[in-house]
């Protein structure tokens, strides 16, 4: 499938979710850590969280990671004023290895506002574009290729397991029948229309769009998001100094359950937020995306 044009990096100027809560947590660290410590921003995106941290802590340095070329471009432009205090690396956090210990590892999971708002990326069912959904448009198979190659059974299982969609069998059957009879879908809205047709009319206009869970499942599969998260949860504690913070922000239950379980069972970590931190009503009003966010924080234990 041909890729659509990639938009300007300026669209990454979104509001970082729960920025105040992250800064507040960092300020609770011992001052000797925040005076000259290193932070690993595992999902730098447009650089919003990193910019806030660098502005609030003049002695801190950040290594920022991202696999999206447009995010790298946007973050580099936004953070250039911080000079050598910021280093940006083009990589998936699952592939990152590091030896210098950090005072914090921060991960803001999932798809960004920019990626949702840019039709050419193919993440949105509201804006028509190619059925792509790759975080890195230059690597791996697109969502269109995925639905083409999977069997109906495997597609149904994927939609059920990664999207928690109860109508997964009906949706998979519809998609595979359409592909067999009419060839590839013309774009994301064409696919979304087919998915919506698997729901009773009264359920097509509810609070949650009929395509939400299926699009989520395809995006997670295309980018191996849960596999990458499992890798991060395993490796990140080794990057931390004693008392260093591991902060993970998730936007759906599949991610949050894994983060919660890992923090609870990992003997390298002490859970600091027994319940997830949620965005304030004021933030949700300004930034509706923050409503589904859950921030969990743990600290590196001293291991003898």
From Swiss-Prot:
Enzyme Commission (EC) number: 2.1.1.199
Record NCBIfam families: 16S rRNA (cytosine(1402)-N(4))-methyltransferase RsmH
Keyword match Ligase: no
Superkingdom to which the source organism belongs: Bacteria
Chief localisation class: cytoplasm
Keyword set, alphabetical order: Cytoplasm, Methyltransferase, rRNA processing, S-adenosyl-L-methionine, Transferase
GO cellular component assignments: cytoplasm
Keyword rRNA processing applies: yes
GO MF annotations, alphabetized: rRNA (cytosine-N4-)-methyltransferase activity
Family (UniProt): Belongs to the methyltransferase superfamily. RsmH family.
GO biological-process terms attached to the record: rRNA base methylation
Protein's name in the database: Ribosomal RNA small subunit methyltransferase H
Compartments in which it is found: Cytoplasm
Biological function: Specifically methylates the N4 position of cytidine in position 1402 (C1402) of 16S rRNA.
Pfam families: Methyltransf_5
Reactions catalysed: cytidine(1402) in 16S rRNA + S-adenosyl-L-methionine = N(4)-methylcytidine(1402) in 16S rRNA + S-adenosyl-L-homocysteine + H(+)
List of residues binding S-adenosyl-L-methionine: 47-49, 66, 93, 108, 115
């Amino acid at each position: 499938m041909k890729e659509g044009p990639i938009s300007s990096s300026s669209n990454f100027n979104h509001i970082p979710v729960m920025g105040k809560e992250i800064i507040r947590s960092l300020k609770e660290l011992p001052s000797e850590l925040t005076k000259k410590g290193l932070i690993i921003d595992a999902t730098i995106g447009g650089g919003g969280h990193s910019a806030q941290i660098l502005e609030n802590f003049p002695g801190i340095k950040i290594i920022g990671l991202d696999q999206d070329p447009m995010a790298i471009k946007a973050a580099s432009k936004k953070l250039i004023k911080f000079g050598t205090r910021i280093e940006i690396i083009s990589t998936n956090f699952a592939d990152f290895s590091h030896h210098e210990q950090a005072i914090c590892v921060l991960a803001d999971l999932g798809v960004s506002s920019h990626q949702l708002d840019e039709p050419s990326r193919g993440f949105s069912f509201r804006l028509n574009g190619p059925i792509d959904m790759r975080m890195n448009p230059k690597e791996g198979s697109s969502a269109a290729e995925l639905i083409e190659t999977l069997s109906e059974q495997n597609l149904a299982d994927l939609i059920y397991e990664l999207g928690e969609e109860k109508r997964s069998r009906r949706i998979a059957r519809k998609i595979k029948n359409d592909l067999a009879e009419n060839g590839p879908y013309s774009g994301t809205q064409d696919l979304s229309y087919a998915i919506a047709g698997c729901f009773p009319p009264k359920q097509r206009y509810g609070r949650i769009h009929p395509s939400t869970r299926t699009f989520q499942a395809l995006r997670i599969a295309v980018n191996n998001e849960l596999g990458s998260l499992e890798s991060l949860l395993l490796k990140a504690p080794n990057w931390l100094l004693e008392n260093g913070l591991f902060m993970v922000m998730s936007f759906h239950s599949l991610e949050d359950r894994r983060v919660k379980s890992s923090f609870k069972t990992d003997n390298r970590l002490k859970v600091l937020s027994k319940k997830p931190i949620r965005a304030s009503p004021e933030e949700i009003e300004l930034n509706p995306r923050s409503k589904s966010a859950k921030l969990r924080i743990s600290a590196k234990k001293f291991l003898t």
